[in-house]
Amino acid sequence: MSSHAEPTPVARNRKPLTLPALRAMQQRGEKIAMLTAYESTLARVADEAGVDTILVGDSLGMVVQGHASTLPVTLDEMAYHTRCVARGLQGGAAWLVADLPFASYHQGPSQAMAAAATLMQAGAQMIKLEGGGWTAETVRFLVERGVPVCAHLGLTPQSVHALGGYRIQGRDEAGAAELRRQATELTQAGAAMMVLELMPSAVAAAVQADNPQLMTIGIGAGPATAGQVLVVHDMLGLTRGKLPRFVRNFMHSEAGQNLSVEDAIRAYVAAVKDASFPDPVAHAYASAS
């Protein structure tokens, strides 16, 4: 059985986004809407719905492959899904970011460069890597060689066992200070963008204030970041089980109507842009008192 839909790229109404264009969005106070995608059709829908940045996340290990964590995902699998998404974005506008999976960059800059090259040759325009100060040398090495880098602090799922599970990071004073220190170190190393995951809103706000040139993208980090990201399966209500409090199901409108996938993604983009999502109470976390 096959689809008979026309596979060729269609014209979009937006100009392709670049790193300078994303920076300009931040400078004029426009929020950046990021969303995950793992295959071409949904990537195209997300692009047409106005998503600014598509993330081919190693979260595919959980929501696509059915694993309990992101750890089993391989570089070859990330490259495959990146190629799929890149084909869906042909003729589109969204900026494409791809995750370096576990153990593909941990041995140092040279290994990271080889892995980054694989993903960029597959169509990525920026690579994302998890980790604190120990990744600064690698970030600098990649940026000096023309690879745009998105860092990732807070809850880093590839370190789930070391962290003792999916727990909020930086809730106490010492933890918050360490996250701020690491964020500044990675920014100085050249990271242009940074995902801040599962941390108190005040900590994420401080990271952004410390590094005004950094494009912070929050997920469970409150409303003060330069943008937001969600896993597409979560915001479409496809994920089963208990979801984190920062997730909102956009398949249902505020008026109680059921939306199409494209309209749900449009609603997500609009909510990010007008700062109605995330809610500073319902979708956020506070520091320990």
Curated annotation (Swiss-Prot):
Keywords: Cytoplasm, Magnesium, Metal-binding, Pantothenate biosynthesis, Transferase. The active site is at E197. It comes from the Bacteria. CDD domains: KPHMT-like. Binds 1 Mg(2+) ion per subunit. Its main location: cytoplasm. 3-methyl-2-oxobutanoate binds at D58, S59, D99, K128. Pathway: Cofactor biosynthesis; (R)-pantothenate biosynthesis; (R)-pantoate from 3-methyl-2-oxobutanoate: step 1/2. Mg(2+) binds at D58, D99, E130. It catalyses: 3-methyl-2-oxobutanoate + (6R)-5,10-methylene-5,6,7,8-tetrahydrofolate + H2O = 2-dehydropantoate + (6S)-5,6,7,8-tetrahydrofolate. GO terms for cellular component: cytoplasm. It is found in: Cytoplasm. InterPro entries: Pantoate_hydroxy_MeTrfase, Pyrv/PenolPyrv_kinase-like_dom, Pyrv_kinase-like_dom_sf. It is an enzyme of class 2 (transferase). Its cofactor is Mg(2+). The keyword Transferase applies. One of its GO terms (molecular function) is magnesium ion binding. Its EC number is 2.1.2.11. PANTHER family: 3-METHYL-2-OXOBUTANOATE HYDROXYMETHYLTRANSFERASE. Belongs to the PanB family. NCBIfam families: panB (TIGR00222), PRK00311.1 (NF001452). Homodecamer; pentamer of dimers. Catalyzes the reversible reaction in which hydroxymethyl group from 5,10-methylenetetrahydrofolate is transferred onto alpha-ketoisovalerate to form ketopantoate. This is 3-methyl-2-oxobutanoate hydroxymethyltransferase. It comes from Leptothrix cholodnii (strain ATCC 51168 / LMG 8142 / SP-6). The gene is panB.
